[in-house]
């Protein structure tokens, strides 16, 4: 991000989570949130395209959208831009399922507990408190390892 847009990102801790929606035996996932200041340039779609290029460089091969959840080497998502609602064929912000995913909200709350993904919406902390996801989200590596 610093290379692409000249901004130094903040990074959450990494969190270990069960392989959500995957066949038994699929290794756990590592999740992390990265946050940076956005000055309205580039456009959100340009940011998303850059993230897709990074995925590709790291060995991800994308499959059809209707294939369901599949294990992958890397998955980068543009989750939200504080106070921005964005709906285009390519990108929806905030991420339409962000509020349902503890593995997203816990690391996000670590960095930006009080931001609102939509202008009048709940804070990240409030979304986390109301999140229906009961899956295990553990700090990685676990303390004491």
What are these regions (language model features)?
Residues 1-43, 48:
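Short, surface-exposed acidic-centric catalytic microdomains
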Residues 20-24, 28-29, 45-145:
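Flexible, gly/pro- and Lys/Arg-enriched active-site loops
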């Amino acid at each position: 991000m610093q290379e692409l847009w000249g901004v130094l990102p903040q990074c959450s801790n990494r969190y270990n989570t069960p392989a959500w929606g995957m066949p038994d035996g699929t290794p756990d996932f590592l999740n992390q949130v990265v946050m940076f200041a956005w000055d309205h340039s580039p456009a959100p779609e340009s940011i998303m395209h850059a993230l897709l290029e990074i995925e590709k460089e790291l060995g991800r091969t994308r499959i059809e959208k209707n294939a369901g959840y599949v294990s992958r080497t890397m998955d980068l998502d543009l989750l939200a831009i504080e106070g921005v609602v964005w709906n285009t064929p390519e990108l929806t912000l905030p991420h339409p399922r962000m509020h349902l995913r503890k593995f997203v909200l816990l690391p996000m709350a670590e960095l930006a507990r009080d931001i609102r993904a939509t202008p009048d919406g709940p804070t990240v902390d409030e979304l986390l408190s109301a999140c229906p996801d009961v899956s295990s989200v553990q700090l990685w590596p676990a303390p004491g390892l």
